[in-house]
């Protein structure tokens, strides 16, 4: 879990040798959902302050769509 997130299984990919971060989550179907990515170089704290709320909103939209489709 990323500190400050309401999503218990929100994780980040960290490609080796870069400051790029990709936030992802496994949805209730156990499908990996890549929510957003960005380069946090020089923005170590600000990156998460902006990225986590956006990732949470995107994930909620994804879950809403799954509910509308009857998938969950």
Language-model region placement:
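Short, hydrophobic/aromatic-rich segments at coil-to-beta transitions
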Residues: 5-12
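Enriched for short, Lys/Arg-rich terminal
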Residues: 14, 18-72
